[in-house]
Amino acid sequence: MFSTATDTIALSTASGGLFAPFPTGIPALDEPEIADGFLGAFKIHDIHGNLVGFGTEQEVIDFDTAIASTTFTLTLPGRGTLMLSQIEDTSVYFAEVEDMIADEEYIRSFDPPLVAVTTVQGTGRVIGGTGEFRHARGRMREIDYLYEANLIDRAFNLTDLIQVKIW
């Protein structure tokens, strides 16, 4: 689990994308070959809020359909690394942004949070790993909790819960 508000190490998209680059000055993904990409690095917590590692999320987004091909690399020091993949449907967020723009409401808070399972059913996979996860196979799904969307600062207070079942 990670929060974009408190756990972001680095984040990059194409210039003018929904997310502002972090830290300031990090290279943007502006070249045509990678302009549909999203790259984030985050601290990772377990379900109890304990810091357990760090990871990356990489996406290539089809902006016409809001469908993304997404991979995660989760590094848990002393245990190993997990590699996950999924097809992700982010249309709930695209619709929310379009609604905010139409309403000229450029900052929107959600209480309770807007909750979305973005993993397209049957596509979330544990595809391998290292250390104790070296033979890992299984399923995963991503559940997002959106607390605030700020289109002015291009900041989203979003918690990602990554559920993993290994067999």
Where are each of the predicted segments found?
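Short beta-turn/strand-loop junction motif enriched in small, turn-promoting residues
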Residues: 60, 129, 145-147
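Extracellular or lumenal secretory-pathway regions
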Residues: 1-118
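Extended beta-sheet lipid-handling architectures
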Residues: 119-126
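A short, structured loop/turn motif at beta-sheet edges
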Residues: 75-83, 127-138
